[in-house]
């Protein structure tokens, strides 16, 4: 039987996926501003900025010229981190909540490495004392 934390975790996962699907649909189907900006970016324009160009327009042009893999990494890494955290809340063992988040995972791996080094140093000191 599921406890309250697991139920709330599943509700959080389902809401997160629903909001993600709605945002994905909005960006790629409904939002005409995004489509207009994408078309402006593709059309050939002179390389010299106009005198009437504002800094926001030039910033939009520069941001749209970034490669796709960079945009994908900027959005997908935090997206998957939040999703994996919500998914870890659905597990039965409360001690395993949050282990899939990158900073926590790195801290655990480094802590295990340090404890392994300390243990190996203790073993080598014991061997020196015994001989």
Swiss-Prot record:
Record carries keyword Transmembrane helix: yes
GO cellular component, one term: Golgi membrane
Pfam families assigned to the protein according to its UniProt record, in alphabetical order: TMEM251 (PF15190)
Key words of the record: Golgi apparatus, Membrane, Transmembrane, Transmembrane helix
UniProt main location, coarse: Golgi
GO process annotations (BP): lysosome organization; regulation of vesicle-mediated transport
Chain ranges passing through the membrane: 8-28, 66-86
Cellular location(s): Golgi apparatus membrane
Recorded topology in the membrane: Multi-pass membrane protein
Taxonomic superkingdom: Eukaryota
Family membership: Belongs to the LYSET family.
Function description: Required for mannose-6-phosphate-dependent trafficking of lysosomal enzymes. LYSET bridges GlcNAc-1-phosphate transferase (GNPTAB), to the membrane-bound transcription factor site-1 protease (MBTPS1), thus allowing proteolytic activation of the GNPTAB. GNPTAB is involved in the regulation of M6P-dependent Golgi-to-lysosome trafficking of lysosomal enzymes. LYSET is thus an essential factor for maturation and delivery of lysosomal hydrolases.
Record-given protein name: Lysosomal enzyme trafficking factor
Lineage: Eukaryota, Metazoa, Chordata, Craniata, Vertebrata
């Amino acid at each position: 039987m599921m406890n309250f934390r697991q139920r709330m975790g599943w509700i959080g996962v389902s809401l997160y996926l629903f909001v993600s699907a709605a945002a994905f649909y909005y960006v790629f189907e409904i939002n005409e501003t995004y489509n207009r900006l994408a078309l402006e970016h593709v059309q050939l324009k002179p390389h010299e900025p106009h005198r009437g160009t504002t800094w926001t327009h030039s910033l939009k042009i520069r941001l749209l010229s970034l490669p796709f893999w960079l945009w994908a990494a900027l959005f997908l890494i935090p997206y998957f981190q939040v999703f994996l955290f919500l998914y870890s809340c659905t597990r039965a063992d409360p001690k395993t909540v949050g282990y899939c988040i990158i900073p926590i995972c790195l801290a655990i791996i480094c802590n295990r490495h340090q404890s392994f080094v300390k243990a190996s140093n203790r073993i080598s000191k014991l061997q020196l004392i015994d001989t």
